[in-house]
């Protein structure tokens, strides 16, 4: 069973709101709304599913919106565009234990080039301290200092005590010196494994 599927099967119904990225964005005060509501000003926005058990940025798009969003897919939402580092941070009982930075081309939200351990410190957001102190594992994704996504799990890409994780999208891979290949398939996104060191 996929780790996200297990989370969805075991989460308390009262906690489901945190997994809805539109509701989370509204709680955090971001400029956002569901498909079918007007944006406050013309510009670049991120448009993605409100809920996505697959994760991995599936169906996320950067779109220039004038005003109306009636043309967007139902079940998606728009949110102001953030700039900055993309960090994935693990907390165990509220204490940060891992921070990794993701690197990718601007043309994709799914096929990341690599993730690298970094030493950034990101305090657990107050909204999570208040409502989810009872969760052992919390994984947060940030762009800049902006919380964009929450999972009740840890980052399995670093389960091998590695410092770097390079997703592999094809079986034909040459393993560079200093790396080793691990099978780590993600069928929905098409990942077959990773190079780690």
Segments from the language model and where they lie:
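Active-site nucleotide/adenylate-binding loops and adjacent lid/helix of ATP-dependent enzymes
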Residues: 2-127, 170
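ATP-dependent carboxylate activation and anion-phosphoryl transfer catalytic cores
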Residues: 54-56, 105-197
């Amino acid at each position: 069973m996929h780790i996200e599927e297990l989370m969805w099967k075991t989460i308390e119904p009262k906690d489901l709101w945190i997994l809805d990225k539109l509701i989370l964005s509204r709680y955090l005060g971001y400029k956002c709304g569901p498909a079918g509501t007007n944006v406050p000003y013309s510009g670049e926005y991120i448009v993605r599913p409100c809920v996505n058990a697959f994760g991995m940025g599936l169906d996320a798009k950067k779109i220039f919106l004038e005003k109306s969003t009636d043309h967007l897919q139902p079940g998606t939402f728009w949110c102001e565009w953030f700039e900055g580092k993309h960090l994935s941070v693990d907390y165990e009982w509220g204490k940060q234990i891992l921070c990794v930075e993701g690197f990718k081309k601007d043309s994709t939200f799914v096929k990341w080039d690599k993730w690298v351990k970094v030493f950034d410190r990101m305090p657990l957001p107050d909204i999570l301290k208040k409502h989810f102190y009872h969760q052992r594992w919390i994984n947060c994704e940030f762009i800049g200092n902006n919380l964009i996504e929450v999972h009740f799990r840890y980052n399995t890409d670093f389960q091998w005590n590695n410092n770097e994780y390079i997703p592999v999208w094809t079986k034909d891979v040459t393993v560079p010196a200093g790396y080793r290949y691990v099978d780590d398939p993600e069928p929905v996104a098409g990942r077959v494994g990773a190079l780690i060191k």
